[in-house]
Regions:
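RNase H-like, two-metal
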Residues: 1-163
Length: 163
C-alpha cells in the first residue's frame, strides 16, 4: 500500500497522520487472505501504543479473529524482524517513487528528506518553474519556507481553489 503526497496533505488538514496510519493498517489487514491465527506486529505511531492497537481493531470486521492477536510497540522494527523487513521494503518503495519523480521532472530531486541539499535545490527549482509538484507534500514546512521566499501569496492548499 502506498500513500500519495496528496493523501498525506489531506490527512493533515483533517484527522491527522496518526489516523491516516490507523486507516492504512486497517485497510491492509482487511486484505489478508486468512483471518485466523494471525500475529500482527505494528510500529506504533501514537504516543500510546495500546491506543494505536485499539483504534486499528475498533472497526476491523469480525475482530477478534480466531487465535489472532495484535501487538503495537514503539520502535517495533528493533524487536520484530518482520517489522524491520516491512520498514526496509517501505523505504525501497519510497526510493523508487523518488527516482520516478526525478525521471519525470528531468533532474535530481535528492532523497526527499529536508536535510538533503539536493532535495532543497530541487524544491526551489520546482517552485520557481511551476509551483508545487503533485508528488510533493504541499503542507511540508520546507515547501512553505521556499514558497514564501520565492512566490507571492500563500502556499496552495490541496482541495482548495486559489482566488
Amino acid at each position: 500500500m502506498t500513500l500519495s503526497a496528496e493523501t498525506i496533505d489531506l490527512a493533515l488538514q483533517g484527522k491527522g497522520l496518526n489516523w491516516l496510519e490507523v486507516d492504512g493498517f486497517r485497510q491492509a489487514l482487511e486484505t489478508l487472505p486468512s483471518k485466523e491465527g494471525v500475529q500482527i506486529f505494528a510500529d506504533a505511531c501514537d504516543v500510546n501504543a495500546q491506543r494505536f492497537t485499539q483504534r486499528i481493531l475498533a472497526d476491523l470486521p469480525q475482530w477478534p479473529w480466531p487465535e489472532s492477536r495484535m501487538t503495537s510497540e514503539h520502535k517495533a522494527d528493533t524487536r520484530y524482524p518482520v517489522v524491520a523487513m516491512a520498514s526496509i521494503l517501505a523505504k525501497e518503495e519510497r526510493d523508487r517513487s523518488i527516482a520516478a519523480m526525478a525521471a519525470r521532472v528531468g533532474f535530481n530531486v535528492g532523497s526527499g528528506y529536508p536535510s538533503d541539499p539536493n532535495t532543497k535545490a530541487a524544491l526551489r527549482d520546482l517552485i520557481l518553474q511551476s509551483g508545487i509538484d503533485a508528488d510533493v507534500r504541499w503542507g511540508w514546512a520546507t515547501v512553505e519556507r521556499f514558497w514564501s521566499a520565492q512566490r507571492q501569496g500563500d502556499v496552495p492548499v490541496r482541495g482548495q481553489q486559489r482566488t
